[in-house]
Amino acid sequence: MSMLPTFGFTQEQVACVCEVLQQGGNIERLGRFLWSLPACEHLHKNESVLKAKAVVAFHRGNFRELYKILESHQFSPHNHAKLQQLWLKAHYIEAEKLRGRPLGAVGKYRVRRKFPLPRSIWDGEETSYCFKEKSRSVLREWYAHNPYPSPREKRELAEATGLTTTQVSNWFKNRRQRDRAAEAKERENNENSNSNSHNPLNGSGKSVLGSSEDEKTPSGTPDHSSSSPALLLSPPPPGLPSLHSLGHPPGPSAVPVPVPGGGGADPLQHHHGLQDSILNPMSANLVDLGS
């Protein structure tokens, strides 16, 4: 444990100071401490010093320097979670500045796809929203046992998975919400299925309580829709008048109105004459048919 030249601290002491200042959130003081370090290559390659430099670069918005540090050095797995957060948050901030608005879940997913984690801070294991599958497996197993872990259990789970206590709490909260939504959807589907099975419809699709078209038609009303078009359009037998001539009696518009002083025809005489012209030929023809 030799002292660094012209500095007065050992390498282990420098690493300890960096860790203490990071955990205390004294980023400005940490930056000044790093600036005061002597130009010793062995010291500047220390992992605690490199991590401290990455934290200072992030808080100062010097993302290019941050990316360079994270990509150029191989970090230990116990530092991966912290450095991965710096990598992703820096890219999120840059994307938000370009777009001029905060990123949603889809926007953050696209950023992660565009800027994947470098292997220097990632062991290559498949991740889902920055959760390793191994960590998710531990959380799922605990959830099956107890969906409501206590604060102490959340801290233990955080240590076992490498996540923060907040991440563990959010995972359980989101999982409970998804399960409640799935249960509500299943209940709704079951209720719809039961209501369909009790629907008062017979096999032909008609309501048992309803009535057919024949029942709706009054008995004294002729069913014009059932008449054959061919029958209506076929010419009448010789000697019989056309069906059109046997239609409804002429309306008021067909009866001539006498003009005062004009000597017009009597409407009553016209009506009797029209009736005779229709009925007399029919009587003669019916007599001929009967003979």
Curated annotation (Swiss-Prot):
Residues 249-259 have a biased composition (Pro residues). Residues 168-279 are annotated as: Disordered. Keywords: Developmental protein, DNA-binding, Homeobox, Nucleus. The keyword Transferase does not apply. Its main location: nucleus. GO terms for molecular function: DNA-binding transcription activator activity, RNA polymerase II-specific; DNA-binding transcription factor activity; DNA-binding transcription factor activity, RNA polymerase II-specific; protein-containing complex binding; RNA polymerase II cis-regulatory region sequence-specific DNA binding; sequence-specific double-stranded DNA binding. Residues 179-190 have a biased composition (Basic and acidic residues). Changing residue 276 to N: In a renal hypodysplasia patient. Residues 124-183 bind DNA. Strongly expressed in skeletal muscle. Expressed in Wilms' tumor and in the cap mesenchyme of fetal kidney (at protein level). InterPro entries: HD, Homeobox_CS, Homeodomain-like_sf, SIX1_SD. It is found in: Nucleus. The keyword Nuclease does not apply. One of its GO terms (biological process) is mesodermal cell fate specification. One of its GO terms (cellular component) is nucleus. Belongs to the SIX/Sine oculis homeobox family. Transcription factor that plays an important role in the development of several organs, including kidney, skull and stomach. During kidney development, maintains cap mesenchyme multipotent nephron progenitor cells in an undifferentiated state by opposing the inductive signals emanating from the ureteric bud and cooperates with WNT9B to promote renewing progenitor cells proliferation. Acts through its interaction with TCF7L2 and OSR1 in a canonical Wnt signaling independent manner preventing transcription of differentiation genes in cap mesenchyme such as WNT4. Interacts with TCF7L2; in a canonical Wnt signaling independent manner; prevents transcription of differentiation genes in cap mesenchyme. Interacts with OSR1; form a strong repressor complex with TCF7L2, TLE2 and TLE3 to prevent the activation of Wnt/beta-catenin target genes in the cap mesenchyme. Interacts with HOXA11, EYA1 and EYA3. This is Homeobox protein SIX2. It comes from Homo sapiens (Human).
